From Swiss-Prot:
GO terms for molecular function: ATP binding; RNA binding; tyrosine-tRNA ligase activity. NCBIfam families: tyrS. This is Tyrosine--tRNA ligase. HAMAP family: Tyr_tRNA_synth_type2. Coiled coil: none annotated. A motif ('KMSKS' region) lies at residues 236-240. The lineage of its organism: Bacteria, Pseudomonadati, Campylobacterota, Epsilonproteobacteria, Campylobacterales. GO terms for biological process: tyrosyl-tRNA aminoacylation. PROSITE patterns: AA_TRNA_LIGASE_I (PS00178), S4 (PS50889).
Length: 406
């Protein structure tokens, strides 16, 4: 019996450690998992999300999937929505002070988070909390007590604060308070483990520090997951950078975006996003190297897996069929944006109004480069007028517009 528990704990710890950059307090995590398998006693893990954007992308899911792994091994997840701290704005990695959100924006975005996380997390083992529950009650005396727990000198050790201080870029006192408030969340929740990205290390360690300072009998472990690179393979996945794959993307878009990553980045996505074991992934890599498995097929399988997870197997297979139809067989897609106009229209103007070109200047350049087709015939004249009827305008391989001229 004891031997069987030890094996299960070892397997759990291998799963937990997969793809993780750093774990502080791994022995404590192992003791919690072992306790669960011996007695069934659960433990508390948490990760905070400031709802500054309404949609999750795959970069967020690296952390959320790790939380789901913990749920399999005895954890109750607290998905903490930082509605209070979002009205301050986390300065992590920023060179300028961020504008706070209104309460209405925060609550609207928080609802969107809740709708999405249960695509990954087990609802029966997840608690959604808002940190306004305790931070609004902190009061002046509580805030003074909290700020007395940490020095300005220690705060300036944080990399982004240090850089801004040396460059004489303004740092507001509110921004100093942010990591203290995030750390206080761990005190209020008495969390056993906290998750975050590698860029959050300072704030995560603040939780451990404050748990000690407030006399808690526990000191949370900290687990840091890597930052997922975006589609460009260089910068971190970010909606503002446009290099993201959103959890709520349409199946066709999600599938196509996964296929657009480089062969090298594909393996990074496999490690951090796929449900396949590391042994299975290593076998795939060996098969690709030996020529037994084409990189394109490996990428298609990854795109199918990810699209199925956030939609359905049927949606994923239809997305693959649509992609093959448009990009492999050079056929017209089943669905595309549509623009209706009255009277003939200049092609460049139609491209802009239909949303397949940002400007008439860019439309001209695309035509001159030979990238524009009408009804699968290359456009030669940048001054072409389109008259009565239906015209399928194509820019490159990915952009289509159905133009109906009345």
């Amino acid at each position: 019996m004891q031997e069987g528990i030890e094996v299960r704990v070892q397997e759990a710890m291998r799963e937990i450690a997969r793809g993780v950059n750093e774990i502080i307090g791994i022995e404590y995590i192992q003791s919690l998992v072992e306790r669960y398998y011996k007695s069934g006693e659960t433990f508390s893990i948490k990760a905070g999300f400031d709802p500054t954007a309404p949609d999750l992308h795959l970069g967020h899911t690296v952390l959320i999937q790790k939380m789901a792994t913990f749920q399999k091994h005895g954890a109750i997840v607290t998905f903490l929505i930082g509605d209070y701290t979002a009205m301050i704005g986390d300065p992590t990695g920023k060179s300028e002070t961020r504008k706070p959100l209104t309460r209405e924006q925060v609550l609207q975005n928080a609802q969107s988070y809740q709708d999405q996380v249960f695509k990954i997390l087990d609802p029966q083992k997840t608690v959604i909390r808002f940190n306004s529950e305790w931070l609004e009650k902190l009061g002046t005396a509580g805030m003074i007590e909290l700020t007395a727990k940490f020095s300005v000198a220690r705060m300036l050790e944080r990399d982004d604060f240090e850089k801004r201080y040396k460059s004489q870029t303004p740092i507001s006192l509110v921004e100093f308070i942010y990591p203290l408030l995030q750390g206080y969340d761990s005190v209020a929740l008495e969390s056993d483990v906290e998750f975050g990205g590698t860029d959050q290390k300072f704030n995560l360690l603040m939780g451990r520090h404050l748990q000690r300072s407030y006399g808690l009998k526990k000191e949370q472990s900290v687990l840091m997951v890597p930052i997922l690179e975006g589609l460009d393979g260089v910068q971190k996945m970010s909606k503002s950078l446009g290099n993201y794959i959103g959890v709520t993307e349409e199946p066709n878009t999600m599938y196509a975006k996964v296929l657009s990553v480089s062969d090298e980045l594909m393996w990074r996505y496999y490690e951090l996003l796929s449900a396949k074991s590391l042994d299975e992934i290593h076998k795939l890599q060996e098969d690709v190297k030996s020529g037994n498995y084409h990189p394109k097929k490996a990428k298609e399988d990854l795109a199918l897996e990810i699209t199925t997870r956030y939609h359905s197997e049927q949606d994923a297979l239809q997305a693959k069929e649509e992609f093959d139809k448009v990009f492999a067989r050079d056929e017209i897609p089943s669905e595309m944006p549509e623009l209706g106009v009255t009277g003939e229209i200049w092609i460049c103007k139609a491209m802009v109004e239909g949303g397949i070109s940002p400007s008439t200047s860019q439309a001209r350049r695309d035509i001159q480069a030979g990238s524009v087709k009408i009804n699968q015939t290359k456009v030669e004249d940048i001054n072409q007028q389109l008259g009565h009827g239906e015209h399928i305008i194509q820019v490159g391989k990915r952009k289509f517009l159905r133009l109906i001229v009345k």
